[in-house]
Amino acid sequence: MNDVVPPAAAESAAAGVSRIALGIEYKGSRYRGWQRQEAGVPSVQEALERALSKVAAEPVGVICAGRTDAAVHASGQVVHFDTAVERPLKAWVMGTNANLPADISVTWARVMPAHFHARFSALARRYRYAIYNDPIRPAHLAEEVTWNHRPLDIGRMREAAQVLVGTHDFTSFRAVQCQAKSPVKTMHHVRLLEHGRLIVLDIRGNAFLHHMVRNIAGVLMTIGAGERPIEWAKEVLEARDRRAGGVTAHPYGLYLVRVEYPGEFELPERYLGPHFLSGLPDIVG
């Protein structure tokens, strides 16, 4: 299913029309993902478009940088839309937020050149997958992290993750229903960070396949628990077969934290998120 947008929004803004970019954060727990669904099924896109349409007093459709799955969160989603309606940038932020549910927020707005595209102008995307590693499940972080009660050896996970850095065929880590034309993607870094009882998979790449981060997390947790050798990550990668890749990790711990664009667009960069990782240092690159 394609994003529901006015025809002009797909490529470049028409004459007399402004292209607006927005920063979006959301808690995805109660949504069937980013993408608009059939009537009555909640999605982040539908809620955002409805709120924007109220501010514009006309239908507004948006294009996003990356379509997140059901129950997946974002602290750094980026969207764009085209409109001939003139509103102060503050109205696109505050007015839209006034019409959004509490688990979705617009964080900034910018007027963009006509050639900016939230998806196709992006250079890289960055995700974080938060694992709460403790025998007792974290009630206050329910639906915000993945809970793993087994002791995980982060050293083993770090060593295994290094084989995923670089340009590879990630067929073993894509969902069966993935519609991407090519399974070849480039991972700039795949890091494991510690933050109290949390183990955080921090991964940055040019693009990602359907369920790719969750499948990587599943493999690394299995290795961290000692159920498979460190070399298993390489074996899974080289198999180029999803059946070799083990269990897909739960969506609750996954966050789209940043989308990177060429400097010419001068988009703001907020904290990486999620909020409970605010003390975790950012590692550039």
Residue ranges of predicted features:
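Structured-RNA-binding interfaces characteristic of tRNA pseudouridine synthases
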Residues: 1-285
